[in-house]
Amino acid sequence: MASSPLPGPNDILLASPSSAFQPDTLSQPRPGHANLKPNQVGQVILYGIPIVSLVIDGQERLCLAQISNTLLKNFSYNEIHNRRVALGITCVQCTPVQLEILRRAGAMPISSRRCGMITKREAERLCKSFLGENRPPKLPDNFAFDVSHECAWGCRGSFIPARYNSSRAKCIKCSYCNMYFSPNKFIFHSHRTPDAKYTQPDAANFNSWRRHLKLTDKSPQDELVFAWEDVKAMFNGGSRKRALPQPGAHPACHPLSSVKAAAVAAAAAVAGGGGLLGPHLLGAPPPPPPPPPPLAELAGAPHAHHKRPRFDDDDDSLQEAAVVAAASLSAAAASLSVAAASGGAGTGGGGAGGGCVAGVGVGAGAGAGAGAGAKGPRSYPVIPVPSKGSFGGVLQKFPGCGGLFPHPYTFPAAAAAFSLCHKKEDAGAAAEALGGAGAGGAGAAPKAGLSGLFWPAGRKDAFYPPFCMFWPPRTPGGLPVPTYLQPPPQPPSALGCALGESPALLRQAFLDLAEPGGAAGSAEAAPPPGQPPQVVANGPGSGPPPPAGGAGSRDALFESPPGGSGGDCSAGSTPPADSVAAAGAGAAAAGSGPAGSRVPAPHHPHLLEGRKAGGGSYHHSSAFRPVGGKDDAESLAKLHGASAGAPHSAQTHPHHHHHPHHHHHHHHPPQPPSPLLLLPPQPDEPGSERHHPAPPPPPPPPPPPPLAQHPHHRGLLSPGGTSCCYPSEDSSEDEDDEEEEQEVDVEGHKPPEGEEEEEGRDPDDDEEEDEETEVLLGDPLVGGGRFLQGRGPSEKGSSRDRAPAVAGAFPLGLNSSRLLQEDGKLGDPGSDLPPPPPPPLAPQKASGGGSSSPGSPVHHPSLEEQPSYKDSQKTKENNQVIVSTKDDNSFSDKNKEHSFFITDSDASGGDFWRERSGEHTQETNSPHSLKKDVENMGKEELQKVLFEQIDLRRRLEQEFQVLKGNTSFPVFNNFQDQMKRELAYREEMVQQLQIIPYAASLIRKEKLGAHLSKS
């Protein structure tokens, strides 16, 4: 706060900028210890607010309830309690007599039954953690605390605050062995000296070091004690944010932030990129400091920042601020379209700030304003609890991701990777400036550009997945990122958009988080944010994408909710630029989420997409099933090379379709590098991605595809392309089930039902049957989409196209000829898609509707799908109901275990059932021979079995749907729901396993026969 430029907040919060508390002011009322009489009433001025004090046991204590109701009124009791516990502040209950005194003194309401009293010093620390500058205590550079603990045989060491930059930092040097330990580990480290007595650690758990680690000096000076308290509070629960104070970022000042929201927004605008960082925190940080942060963040700050991402859990305000800020930032960015942004920001409660910011044109300002504003009104409510429970604290943990805190991977590379993406929040100004796409923030553009370039600016949640925890974006470096997170990248954008938009949007944003497609859907659903993106998307470089106006916006929304949307498109249009921008990392591409605004920005598919690109090898698609790794992808690529007819070309293609895809380009473009990206798509004209071929308007929906995109080239389709992470399996799934191996990849895609029962016959996926219930994705066309996304993502671009085709005509090709199926089927399911070649894309688009980009609920779903899938999917996707984004059951005959799970995903509209079973990990084992064998299999028998299974699955699906409730499946609010749904599906599938052995034996026989005949 000290650095906060706003006098208002400063006056309110702290009299003296240098220190949160003004000792004089604080001690002024205090008479003097000698004179303290029991139950003596006094008054202490905390942050300019008079607080009643009472002398209890010779100590002046303040009424916690009064502090909570005045200074901390913007924070929930829960937040305050958690922070108090985290700070190790014990509350003394006052006696009935003391309570009456407090009531009469006006500190407590008459109805109060009890009151906790805390010392003045504790009150100062508590308020400071919420309102004060959140910087670690100022200590000499080479300062170290002499600390010791008595656990086990005890130990002594030097706690070096300068090294304490994360909760796990090795900052304690053992005095005996001179090794460095983290505080958590140090209490378990002891040297058995002759005189040492063993002490059973008293419930020494990893976070109890603050209780066990004591200053060795028994009577330390007060300054030392206070500094030690501050240090101990650093990465602890609520005050965690204080851990990595940025020069310009004072994330802790939430109230201030709300107060300062408007001023800060303006300041942030002034500060430009720098402002973003500060604002990123609460919009409260003074603009001056913020500017440094951006650079610092880029350069060295990343250390702090990237560590910082351990956002306070308790710090609700922070969390809210982060989420809200991210949302509002994102909204602000989205607010590129000022209207949308303003609306979003306003919604947050930081609305005024957000709107103001939007007006200002500074994404950062907007973010700050929104965040701060939200704070004031208490953004807390704005963020549905999903943040807390459903994502296992993801929200809390990664609100920063949302944009409050530096991205967990804040290293510059990450900045490069995500900055583009996050830039989208800046979208309006920054992103556009960067992308030059549009012209959302004229004035802010320059600054925005900067911010977009640097974490600080981009960090708004736009570029970050709001919940890094579950979906850390794949970094360019290939940091492994669990794909199961789905489209984390989207969340940021979607989150930002949604958040910015309104609580409802917020909710959708969360859903999006849960389901990449969902996010897209929700974003789409929320045109306001989407539209701005739409503009951007069309503007930036989305030559093909623009065609789908709505799509663009939606895409953009999904991809780069606010300003990035254009980026996605543009990325698609300028894949090369993307790749360049990506800088060798899909991350960069993903990062360029805002690419929308800056065409060059990598298509900014999702971070996920980026991940895919970046962490090609890591393609954990589903939480449940492993997906083939790079090797698989490569082998698949090889397989496809021939069958797909040019995986390499696909590469370029991907770009194209993706492009057309709009965001689908996400799928591929992000990873143009992947040779297999979109072999199949190749059929489509690059320009008119299948998506395009399909109803062009729908293509926009594909934003989710980004994931797929990467997956495309990444055999690991982390997100399964289409669906969330789960779909990843798809991509792994062997998108290469190309016709080459006419596996029984029956992508049954019921055209009418939009059912994409893709029977994954992924060669690579022998038992890859990833039953990846793409719950999240829930692309009705999972098959197509899945292929688009999953397949496309997978190295088996071609197969993936095929799959879509198959999906198109689910009954049609088992896999007699994936290609044929693809083309033929294509038309079939995707009646939308006019030409078969496009069909692969189109059907994905069409029949898959969102399949290609599961994330995009609105794929031009196939005919029937389109409407129902679109709407339903939108909702569903938003809700993440679409379980099976990758419907293909790829049963890869490779492993005799070809999975036949054709899981019908929930019908989005209820219309289509997608099979959720994804292929299991695609196995790269002898994919070629197996493929051929499978081709030679008794296709008829297999088809029969498969169809039976599909029927069964469909029935199950329906029952499941009924059980689940309305078709829109709002049920899929969160990750846990998703998991439950997936598990339920799995159980159902297990019941179907009886069929599998039969089919498996058939396949085995066929394979044996084929082998014999071949040999």
From Swiss-Prot:
One of its GO terms (biological process) is cerebellar Purkinje cell differentiation. CDD domains: DHD_Skor. Residues 653-669 have a biased composition (Basic residues). The keyword Transcription applies. Keywords: Cytoplasm, Nucleus, Repressor, Transcription, Transcription regulation. GO terms for cellular component: cytoplasm; nucleus; transcription regulator complex. PANTHER family: SKI FAMILY TRANSCRIPTIONAL COREPRESSOR 2, SKI ONCOGENE-RELATED. Interacts with SMAD2 and SMAD3. Exhibits transcriptional repressor activity. Acts as a TGF-beta antagonist in the nervous system. This is SKI family transcriptional corepressor 2.
